[in-house]
Every structure is written in structure tokens, then in C-alpha cells.
Amino acid sequence: MKFIVKLFPEIMMKSKPVRMRFTKMLETNIRNVLKKVDESAKVKREWDKIMVLVPSDRPDLVEAFADRLSCIPGIAHVLQVNESTFESVDDIYQQTLALYKEQLVGKTFCVRVKRVGNHDFKSIEVERYVGGGLNQFTEATGVKLKNPDMTINLEIDRENLYLVVNRIQGLGGYPMATQEDVLSLISGGFDSGVSSYQFIKRGSRTHYCFFNLGGDQHEIGVKQVAYHLWQKYGESHKVKFISVPFDPVVTEILEKIDNGQMGVILKRMMMRTAARLADKMGIQALVTGEAMGQVSSQTLTNLNVIDRCTEQLILRPLIAMDKQDIINLSRKIGTEDFSKSIPEYCGVISQKPTVKAVLSKIEAEEQKFSDDLIERVLETAEIIDIREIATSMDTKITETETVGDVNSNEVIIDVRAPEEEEKDPLKLEGIEIKTIPFFKLATQFADLDKAKTYLLYCDRGVMSKLQALYLQEQGYENVKVYRP
């Protein structure tokens, strides 16, 4: 079994040197991701595609490889194929008949052929020969060239024949790290998760900067969003997660700043702090989830005033998107349920926020801040490799809270996403196992029997630890992490 990875069309339009660089980077990214699934993964780059070989003795890897390939930026689509050689057009037909005969029963179909190399036949001749044979010797209802029930795709590459078993839609975009790094201001809400995803998809290593206004509980929720985005779409490269305790800034805003100017000034202080961090990390741009007119601080006038606080480039990929479209995209990329469970933390609430801030007035208000305010905030910022989120959770979860054995009064809760749980369900004889996805646990945990202890389980132990800490922050003491 092989996968043929087709490049995103915009890559194909690049000059030869750029196309080569992008393709090499995509090959490396695919290898980095698939090696985490299985060390035996083999990836081979060609001029217009990348081949991924699945070991013949490991058919169990096919689904896992397909799932990972569908989430790697830079891929238009992936063809799962059976590879063979052929001697003639009739041989191609016989192989196609053997594979598709049962699938064609009661269906209309067409045959599409792509061909590379010198042959004594044309692609359309193969389509007609194979299609005619299938129409005559199967129980298909007939050939239909437009909108058939089934399209049979064949690829002929010199002496090799590829029978397409499955076509997997890719993520599109550019390969990770072909564009410059960005620092995304992430709050855990719908907007910041989607804006981060869009830059991952466009090929930028996306680092995360979180301004903590809601304590540990807020930070745990945001880390789940960032970790999910990285693990699913950007796992090929290391990125940083920065947590900035912003309480000192909020305190001074509430004590010193005119009520109507608070929202704009809070955003300016965030941008200044993020710009300093970006400079330190050699990052060229900040990314936010702001959309024009969504809240009072996001009018064009206010956004212009916010931008004036730094020379750093500020990018807003959602600027003209409707809220419902943003939520729909968050659902597609898997962050919607995270964002739903994170409360809205608003550090400063103006009674009558300005929608037309005046730069001179804003700057005059900012003169009231302590001179060393941003320096003090930066000194307390925590910068970690996003892969260390699990390790940082370990320092907060004691050994007694992580268990490998299950007692009679304990119940295991499988917190994996439904599709992951269905692929490999957890089974333990004599043990009660509940399946509650991580994104529903916060709302459903209160309904469980409080007399029992619950052990949270996931494959890698990251989401289970984050959820355990989240519940402990809410005051639940009957929760632990299960690591068999």
C-alpha cells in the first residue's frame, strides 16, 4: 500500500528553486509527523508528488497515516493506492476489474486516467477500454461521465500502475516553516484559535502568547487549545507557549485609567508586551483574532490607535469574517468545544467604551502607568516548549494523583475525542469505563456520583492531565489521572 501526496496547487506555480525548497520541506514535515506514528515510515520525494510507503506487514498503519497526512499543511490531497506493474492495456483492465467489480454493483461510473511516461497508448484510450470492459462485465448500471455514483481513478507512471482506493482531502496551504514565524495572541476563544490555525495552514510556525486574566483555570483551558492546534496541524516543528500574568496591568488600568479608554489601552499594553517578546524571539509579526466591529475596541479607528503602540506588524486574518463563519471553522478544526468550555475573562469592563479613540488622549492616559510596568510583567512571563505542557502538568499533579492500577470504587473516564475512542476502545475486565470526551467533561462531571473516584485516561496523558487540573481548580477532589 502506498500514499501519493499531491502538492497544493500554489506550490506547483512557484519557480523551480522555490518549488524544490517547498517540496523538500514538505517531505521533511511528513517524515517528522509519520515517524511519531511508526519509525518504519518511508517517505520519498519526486518532482510533482511525494510517495509514502506503508510496510506490507503493517496494514494497521494505513488509517493512522491517512489521518495524519490529511492535517499536514501543503498537501492538496492524498491518494491511497494499490501499486503494481502492467504488461498491456488489457492487463490494466483486468486488475481494475478485480478491485472494483463488487463496488460497482448498481452504480453509474466513469474512469479517469492520468499518465506519465512514454507508452503506445493514450490516456483516453485506457479510459475507453477499461470503462467499456467494466460496463460489459460488471453489474454496474452504466457509464455516466458527469456526476457518476463512482469515479475510478487510475494513475500510470511509466511501468507502474496505481489503482486509487481512496482519495483523502488535504489541508492545503504551504508547508510548515516555508514562511516566517508569527506570535499568535491566544485567549482560548473561537477567534484566536481560528486565526492561529490559518497561519499554521499558511506555512508559518505559530508560537502562542497568552495573557492570563483568569488564573490557573483559564491557563489550563488555553493550553488545551494551543496543544490541540499544534498536535493536529503543526506537530512537525517545535513552537513556544508563553504565559504572561497580566494582573499588574489590569490593576493599574482599573485604578488609574479613564473608564471609557480602558479597553483600547488594555489591547495596546498587550501589543507592546507581545512585541517585546516577539523581538526577543526574532519573530516578525503578531497575529490576533480581531474582526472589524465585533466589539467596541475593534472599530477601524480603535484598531488604528492600537496599532500605533508598536512598530511590529500586526496581522488580523479574521478582520472581515462573520462570527458564525468563525465558529463554523472552529468546529471544523476541532477547537469549538474547547472554546465553549472556557469562560469569557474580561479584565476590564468599560461602562461606556469609546468606539472612536483619540490617539493623543490615549497616550496621555498611558502616562499614568508605572514606568517599569511592562518590565515587571515580562520578568514573570513563562516561556516553554509546547511539548513540555505535559511535563509542566506533571509538576502540578502529584504521584498519588497519577495511578496505574484501578480499585473497585474507581471509575475510568476515557476523555479522548469520539473518533479516537472508536478506533481503539479502552477495555479492562471488571472495570467500569465511561466515555466522556474532554470537551464535555467540564459540564458533565458535576452529574456523576460524588462517592466515587474518577480516573481520567487518554493516549498520551496530556489531555487527561489538563482536564484533571481543570476539575481540581473547580474544587473536585475525586479525580486522578490513569496511566497504565
Curated annotation (Swiss-Prot):
Keywords: ATP-binding, Cytoplasm, Disulfide bond, Nucleotide-binding, Redox-active center, RNA-binding, Thiamine biosynthesis, Transferase, tRNA-binding. The keyword Cytoplasm applies. GO terms for cellular component: cytosol. It catalyses: [ThiI sulfur-carrier protein]-S-sulfanyl-L-cysteine + a uridine in tRNA + 2 reduced [2Fe-2S]-[ferredoxin] + ATP + H(+) = [ThiI sulfur-carrier protein]-L-cysteine + a 4-thiouridine in tRNA + 2 oxidized [2Fe-2S]-[ferredoxin] + AMP + diphosphate; [ThiS sulfur-carrier protein]-C-terminal Gly-Gly-AMP + S-sulfanyl-L-cysteinyl-[cysteine desulfurase] + AH2 = [ThiS sulfur-carrier protein]-C-terminal-Gly-aminoethanethioate + L-cysteinyl-[cysteine desulfurase] + A + AMP + 2 H(+). The active site is at C458 (cysteine persulfide intermediate). CDD domains: PPase_ThiI, RHOD, THUMP_ThiI. It is found in: Cytoplasm. It holds the Pfam family THUMP. It is an enzyme of class 2 (transferase). GO terms for biological process: thiamine biosynthetic process; thiamine diphosphate biosynthetic process; thiazole biosynthetic process; tRNA 4-thiouridine biosynthesis. InterPro entries: Rhodanese-like_dom, Rhodanese-like_dom_sf, Rossmann-like_a/b/a_fold, ThiI_AANH, ThiI_fer, ThiI_N, THII_Thiazole_biosynth_dom, THUMP_dom. Its EC number is 2.8.1.4. Residues 63-167 form the THUMP domain. ATP binds at L185, I186, K267, G289, Q298. One of its GO terms (molecular function) is tRNA-uracil-4 sulfurtransferase activity. Belongs to the ThiI family. Catalyzes the ATP-dependent transfer of a sulfur to tRNA to produce 4-thiouridine in position 8 of tRNAs, which functions as a near-UV photosensor. Also catalyzes the transfer of sulfur to the sulfur carrier protein ThiS, forming ThiS-thiocarboxylate. This is a step in the synthesis of thiazole, in the thiamine biosynthesis pathway. The sulfur is donated as persulfide by IscS. NCBIfam families: ThiI_C_thiazole, tRNA uracil 4-sulfurtransferase ThiI. This is tRNA sulfurtransferase. It comes from Shewanella sediminis (strain HAW-EB3). The gene is thiI.
